[in-house]
Amino acid sequence: MEQIKSIYNKLFTKYDSYKRLDEISNVTIGKTPPRSEQSCFTVNKNDIKWVSISDLGKSGMFIFDTSEKLTREAIDKYNVKVIPKDTVILSFKLTVGRTAFTTENMTTNEAIAHFDLNNKKLNNYLYCTLTYFNYSYLGSTSSIATAINSKIVKSIKIGIPSEEQLNKFNNFTSAMFKSVKNNEFENIKLSQLRDILLPKLMNGEIDLDNIEI
């Protein structure tokens, strides 16, 4: 990630134009079905992952799993936006500025914005821009948590790189983004394997003396 940041900072030093986020993308917001209807929320891996700020805090650059899922019935009933794979998402309430890429079709709660870019080549650039952005500039009160809303998010202006700048950035970093994604996925799988094997080892179900390395 530091290497990507270094390339970003070297390439994007000045811009010919600035545009609002809602000028370069369709900005949508998530939703929470009524908590009184517990049947909406599940932990079934076959249901649609529902991203919270807490989930973003536990994820890296890419979000692979969520603590809760929504049923398809709940999504349809309450018109919850389903966002596609590789969408950049941003938290803008309570904890402002957490970012991630989705890794499959997902939903989020109302504290998270999604950016469906008009130009998909801007995707990695937008992720970096929102990750490095100083959100304190947006605050009109002492509490940034209460100062940000969806209207402010949509009105954020960012520099628009030239085609040459953008192509250079994508050429230099696309393999790095893929590597980060693969590494994060492998780390999750290793953690899951550890959680399965460690109790068996502690209970004596696995004998290390019989394992060949």
Give the predicted meaning of each segment:
Residues 22-161:
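DNA target-recognition domains and sequence-specific DNA-contacting regions of bacterial/archaeal
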